[in-house]
From Swiss-Prot:
This is UPF0237 protein MJ1558. It comes from the Archaea. GO terms for cellular component: cytosol. The lineage of its organism: Archaea, Methanobacteriati, Methanobacteriota, Methanomada group, Methanococci. Belongs to the UPF0237 family. InterPro entries: ACT-like_dom_sf, ACT_dom, UPF0237/GcvR_regulator, UPF0237_ACT. Residues 5-79 form the ACT domain. GO terms for biological process: DNA-templated transcription. Gene3D superfamilies: 3.30.70.260. It comes from Methanocaldococcus jannaschii (strain ATCC 43067 / DSM 2661 / JAL-1 / JCM 10045 / NBRC 100440).
Length: 90
């Protein structure tokens, strides 16, 4: 299984979850876990996504998600799960 972590941060607005999820669904990427919160109008979301059966490669999916983030006015960071874990280990 090939998994990536998608992090989204920015000012809260309608459609962020829908916009990011739409890109994943269109590319046959499966959301395994999702957590999101809003703190004083700041939106933060993290998703664990299985891209094993995705229609596009990692680089293409990353670009599409980043483009969707720009359109939504949020920052999107996409990392392979192992890199994310390495960067956030204690």
């Amino acid at each position: 299984m090939s998994r990536v972590v998608v992090s989204v941060i920015g000012q809260d607005r309608t459609g962020i979850v829908a916009g990011i999820s739409k890109v994943l669904a269109e590319n046959n990427a499966n959301i395994l876990d999702i957590s999101q919160t809003i703190m004083d109008n700041l939106f933060a979301m993290i998703m664990l996504v299985d891209i094993s059966n995705a229609k596009v490669d990692f680089a293409t999916l990353k670009k599409e998600l980043e483009k969707a983030g720009e359109e939504l006015g949020v920052q999107v960071i996409v990392q392979h799960e192992d890199i994310f874990k390495y960067m956030h280990r204690i």
